[in-house]
Amino acid sequence: MLEQNRDEFIAEMLCIADTDWVLGHWYIKVMLNGRSLTDCTAFAGMAQDTLGHARALFRFLEDEMDLPEHQLEFGRGPSQIHDMEMLSAPPENWGDFLITTFIAEGAIWQMLNTFRASVHPGVAGMVTHFGKELYFHRLGLEGWLKSATDEAKQDMRDAMQTRLPTALRWFDDQARSDSDDLRSSGIRSSSVAEAKMAFIETTISKLMAALDMDDTSSITPIEQVDWDALRRKTRGSELPATLWEFMIPTDEDTVILRRPLAVSVDDNLDLFDREEYSQDD
């Protein structure tokens, strides 16, 4: 793989992995606010899947970049994350949460699907495996959408006005898709423009049907001003401090609890052979 293609490939994979990483924490945060025990267990399962996908991609990229294990999760700051900017704003209500997560799930899948038949070894298998789990996420969210109250549906229509333009911007424009070196080299097996169209035809059309919306002409697109193409977000933007603290806590007790498994295992290995435990009472 050419060095330029390698850098672009890593950046694109991080856009997917980091968006999954943030979305997984959305599910964790909202988990105890479910309307029923079934809701809570569903969010727990979706969080587990989503964070599992993010960490699998992190491990894959750490191998690609010859980085130490867990570097991508614990070794970056909030300004280095490639997440979808839409997820930086917390949900205002239940309807907003459903709209935002449904949009995010659909967008992640369509972007990931552009690597489904990649010439890069190992990528296609991950896409197929992740796709099966993401399908059930979307089914669950569709069920919540269809069973929503009239009040929640109005909240969803309002949320569409703010959430959808940011999600569409994530796919960037036609010109970038046409000049994509990853597509021409076969690393990406279908174009981002095709992914954007599929996102509109599937995810957005389902939302419009569920919300009895005739069209989205009232939704104003966002111009790509000072756009960071590699991170697919506004240049210089970073995760809000409260969201980042929830993802990577800094207080001492939580840091101990959130240590990578490899570190925890090393700390406890041969515990009784250590000097501090070798003295008789």
Q: Where do the PLM segments sit?
A:
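Acidic/His metal-coordination segments adjacent to aromatic residues that form catalytic metal sites
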Residues: 1-14, 75-101, 118, 151, ...
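Alpha-helical scaffold segments that form or flank carboxylate-/histidine-based iron centers
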Residues: 8-15, 34-53, 97, 122-135
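Hydrophobic packing residues in well-ordered alpha-helices of helical domains and bundles
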Residues: 13, 43, 98, 127, ...
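Generic structural signal for well-ordered, non-transmembrane alpha-helical segments
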Residues: 18-21, 48-55, 102-106, 128, ...
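Helix-loop segments that flank and shape redox-cofactor active sites
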Residues: 23-45, 107-124
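Conserved alpha-helical segments that form or flank metal/cofactor-binding pockets of metalloenzymes
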Residues: 47-75, 141-146
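Internal, conserved structured core segments that host functional sites
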Residues: 86-140
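Extended, helix-rich structural scaffolds rather than catalytic motifs
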Residues: 154-281
